[in-house]
């Protein structure tokens, strides 16, 4: 009887530990992913970028913003805005690879890490991002055209500081918004004008 009880108790403890580990993994995943889009969130982005910069791995950050998103929410409602975010997120997920990860940064902003700063690969990825916005989205059952502005900054070319790299990509994105939207721009002297 004692042997049976010890075996059962060990089994129960292993099962409990397994359930606790599963719960921890679910909580960790939830803490690092955006609920609406399923993409990794800003916290996960910062952790991943910090690891790359800490290891001195050249990389490129692309900040993406849906043009006139407030107008979508104001005209069609927040449910339609959520639909637009989900559709853009799904397209960005389709682009992901071993060297490209998409994140929901904030509001209608997404951010990508390309684990390369090679100019041809960066440009190819920027054009792929433009295609994400070139396709219509379905809002309330109707197809609508959206646009997106994309800012690009590379480590270590533009800066070797994590926070500054994000600022550089953001500055480049706002340059696009200022100059007509629905395009991409690289951070550089032209963004400082």
What annotation goes with each model-predicted range?
Residues 61-63, 186:
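Core hydrophobic beta-sheet residues of small sensory/regulatory alpha/beta domains
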Residues 61, 110, 148-152:
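A structural signal for short, well-ordered beta-strand segments
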Residues 25-32, 38-60, 67-97, 103-107, ...:
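Conserved long alpha-helical elements within nucleotide-processing catalytic cores of c-di-GMP signaling
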Residues 102, 128, 142, 149-157, ...:
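Cyclic nucleotide signaling catalytic output domains
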Residues 94-99, 131-143, 175:
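Short catalytic/binding micro-motifs of nucleotide second-messenger systems
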Residues 1-7:
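Selective detector of the "anchor" transmembrane alpha-helix that sits immediately C-terminal
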């Amino acid at each position: 009887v004692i042997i049976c009880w010890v075996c059962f108790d060990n089994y129960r403890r292993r099962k409990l530990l397994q359930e606790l580990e599963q719960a921890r993994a679910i909580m960790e995943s939830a803490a690092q992913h955006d609920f609406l889009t399923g993409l990794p969130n800003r916290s996960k982005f910062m952790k991943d970028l910090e690891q790359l910069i800490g290891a001195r791995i050249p990389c490129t950050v692309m900040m993406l913003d849906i043009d006139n998103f407030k107008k979508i929410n104001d005209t069609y409602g927040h449910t339609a805005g959520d639909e637009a975010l989900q559709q853009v997120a799904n397209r960005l997920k389709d682009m992901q690879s071993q060297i490209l990860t998409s994140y929901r940064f904030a509001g209608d902003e997404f951010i990508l890490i390309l684990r390369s700063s090679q100019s041809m690969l960066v440009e190819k990825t920027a054009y792929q991002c433009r295609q994400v916005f070139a396709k219509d989205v379905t809002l309330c059952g109707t197809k609508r055209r959206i646009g997106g502005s994309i800012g690009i900054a590379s480590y270590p070319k533009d800066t070797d500081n994590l926070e500054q790299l994000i600022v550089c990509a953001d500055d480049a994105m706002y340059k696009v918004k200022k100059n007509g939207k629905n395009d991409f721009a690289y951070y550089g002297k032209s963004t400082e004008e």
